[in-house]
Amino acid sequence: MLFPFPNSPSKPRRVVITGAGIVTALGSGWRVNAVGFREGRQAFRPVTLFDVSRQRVKIAAEVDLPAELPPTKLPARRVARLDRATKMLLLAAHEAWSQSGWQADANIPLVLGTTGGAMSLGENYLTHAIRSPQSQRLQATRVVNYQPQRQALDVCDAFGFSGPITTIANACASGANAIGHAWELVRHGRATRVLTGGHDSLCQLIFAGFDSLQALSPSPCRPFDAQRTGLTLGEGAAILTLETLEHAQQRGAIILGEIIGYAAATDIHHLTQPHPEGNAAFATMTGACKIAGITPNQVDYVNAHGTATPHNDSTEAVAINRWAGTRVATLPVSSTKACVGHTLGAAGAVEAVVSLMTLREQWLPPEPGLVVLDPACGFPIVRERTDACVRVVVSNSFGFGGANATIVMRRWM
């Protein structure tokens, strides 16, 4: 169940974060998002990106993209043709890159998580193919753009590096899996630094699909509420720059935090429903903490996956209760999806950046909208703006098909 990553032939290296970028419906950039998450602001509104007149649900967390993107190596003509997800990805990557102080270097690996090219690539391909099936002139462009790694290639070209690309499409755990894989590359000496994160954009196909599954809530989602009615979709991107502690210290970098544990597991129970006992979720939390060398008693906050669907939240509650043991009654937990919705492949990365914010700025993100706590939760939910001493954070990401991942982060002192 729990995947045992191979041990390095030498002592594992410490991996630190030196840059972070984030784009959500709260805004673009660390500061606006930190303020929004700290205050528990909700960014839901009626959908304007596509027609939802035939859908049961009409709201989502849409991103307001700026009129211009930051300067890159991409020619203006190519920038004009970029899809929505790539634009968000470039904004987040530019912020992380600028903050890190990294200099141009061709040999930097890129590891990204997304749900099949942010889903929008497939939708665009099929839409245009149906509308103009005989247009051979456009067929080559369609095929080239219909690739899950298309957005990763755009990032490489934008920043001028040609390191190896890895694109992970593992449902809603994709962003966390990407960061975990990047962490393993650096930790075990396969890379000195890696650019990593996740991204996804809203699209009509996925919106209609979730609505047909009766998984969407007609009102803003309420994770862990006893009367929750489903998730609310969002979109966004988040990027981290990871490097060895030694490399960061040698160049005098500002260290934002440290990743000290990661684990991934699959329960193979059902296509859309998690295992009722939360076995894989329990395994990832236990495994990640074991690798980190900590116990639940040393964890100060859990950023839950918390989608607000009946099955997911109940299962995650069971898993957290099992994992935390006697610590559970006083362990602060919240789901930031109550603010920006479920960003799918970007979720694990977005929530990793939010977790980093709590470590850097010493507050816990409240969960707006909660009315009655589900009795399955043995832990308290953060409901209002809270200052706290945060040293270690656990961030969970769980996806369809039983894909589970947990990241453990520590404050840098």
Cite the ranges covered by each PLM segment.
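ACP-dependent fatty acid/polyketide chain-elongation machinery
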Residues: 1-78, 100, 246-258, 353-368, ...
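Condensing-enzyme catalytic core mediating Claisen C-C bond formation in acyl metabolism
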Residues: 14-18, 41-46, 220-292, 298-301
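Conserved beta-ketoacyl condensing-enzyme motif
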Residues: 17, 41-170, 199-207, 296-312
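Conserved small-residue
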Residues: 19, 37, 93, 110, ...
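Active-site-proximal alpha-helical scaffold in enzymes
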Residues: 89-99, 148-151, 156-159, 164-197, ...
